[in-house]
């Protein structure tokens, strides 16, 4: 595999262009640098930037079908071997405060033993962990180690978000035990986030498993074992997602039952009130017809006695309902 000149991959508006020093650190790429397997280059681009897009479209270092993939529309996670290189599409939790975490960020990577080209539009928060390690001199030393560390960071962020969703479900279940119904749309959003995570993390787990099983020349056996561990860890997260989705279904039924019971209780209360006041309403309506004059209208105690009779009647009906165990 021939060496690459630094000037061939030094894109002016790149997010960064670094050379791995082989000892866990990096240094900025210069035009005079020689890129080889001992000192691979990591070129990170925002594909909507003009010069980055132009470099992706014209560089001879990338196969033709890779150019479109690195700057194309977002797809589900996948991995494809293209000659000596490998094209990988991954998804990351969205760390932007203006958007929901489940609006996942796509990152595309083309790499071989010498060159790592990664592209994105929105910031990939998980890469900050890898960048910090490289700046401190404790990062990966080669392309295989870089890929394992990136996948590990992506899985860490996904696991943290899955754990947050799990905690929300536990709180929601505790509130339901106290007959506290969540705000409208809360459970639907929670379920949607779980489904979105399930949709993208399942193929991402398959990507990790395939990378662990492929005999890529720039990955060692130890790195393949680490990649398999990452795939297994994400698989456990998927099992947690499946359990959470099932629990949200149970909670939806429980919420519907609680709301139905509340409605039935209110309807029952209104029916009892109607039964209590129905006799008094009948009498007041009957007396209020006034076709032949109001009975007792000329007697000074007529209205008082009528009110007392109504109170006694209402009390009698209430007592009968109580003894009948309707109240």
Swiss-Prot record:
<keyword id="KW-0813">Transport</keyword>
<dbReference type="InterPro" id="IPR002523">
    <property type="entry name" value="MgTranspt_CorA/ZnTranspt_ZntB"/>
</dbReference>
<feature type="transmembrane region" description="Helical">
    <location>
        <begin position="301"/>
        <end position="321"/>
    </location>
</feature>
<dbReference type="GO" id="GO:0005385">
    <property type="term" value="F:zinc ion transmembrane transporter activity"/>
</dbReference>
<feature type="topological domain" description="Cytoplasmic">
    <location>
        <begin position="322"/>
        <end position="327"/>
    </location>
</feature>
<feature type="topological domain" description="Cytoplasmic">
    <location>
        <begin position="1"/>
        <end position="273"/>
    </location>
</feature>
<keyword id="KW-0472">Membrane</keyword>
<keyword id="KW-1003">Cell membrane</keyword>
<feature type="transmembrane region" description="Helical">
    <location>
        <begin position="274"/>
        <end position="294"/>
    </location>
</feature>
<dbReference type="GO" id="GO:0005886">
    <property type="term" value="C:plasma membrane"/>
</dbReference>
<comment type="similarity">
    <text>Belongs to the CorA metal ion transporter (MIT) (TC 1.A.35) family.</text>
</comment>
<dbReference type="GO" id="GO:0000287">
    <property type="term" value="F:magnesium ion binding"/>
</dbReference>
<keyword id="KW-1133">Transmembrane helix</keyword>
<keyword id="KW-0406">Ion transport</keyword>
<dbReference type="InterPro" id="IPR045863">
    <property type="entry name" value="CorA_TM1_TM2"/>
</dbReference>
<keyword id="KW-0812">Transmembrane</keyword>
<dbReference type="InterPro" id="IPR045861">
    <property type="entry name" value="CorA_cytoplasmic_dom"/>
</dbReference>
<keyword id="KW-0997">Cell inner membrane</keyword>
<dbReference type="GO" id="GO:0015087">
    <property type="term" value="F:cobalt ion transmembrane transporter activity"/>
</dbReference>
<dbReference type="InterPro" id="IPR023714">
    <property type="entry name" value="Zn_transp_ZntB"/>
</dbReference>
<comment type="function">
    <text>Zinc transporter. Acts as a Zn(2+):proton symporter, which likely mediates zinc ion uptake.</text>
</comment>
<dbReference type="Pfam" id="PF01544">
    <property type="entry name" value="CorA"/>
</dbReference>
<protein>
    <recommendedName>
        <fullName>Zinc transport protein ZntB</fullName>
    </recommendedName>
</protein>
<keyword id="KW-0862">Zinc</keyword>
<dbReference type="GO" id="GO:0050897">
    <property type="term" value="F:cobalt ion binding"/>
</dbReference>
<dbReference type="GO" id="GO:0015095">
    <property type="term" value="F:magnesium ion transmembrane transporter activity"/>
</dbReference>
<feature type="topological domain" description="Periplasmic">
    <location>
        <begin position="295"/>
        <end position="300"/>
    </location>
</feature>
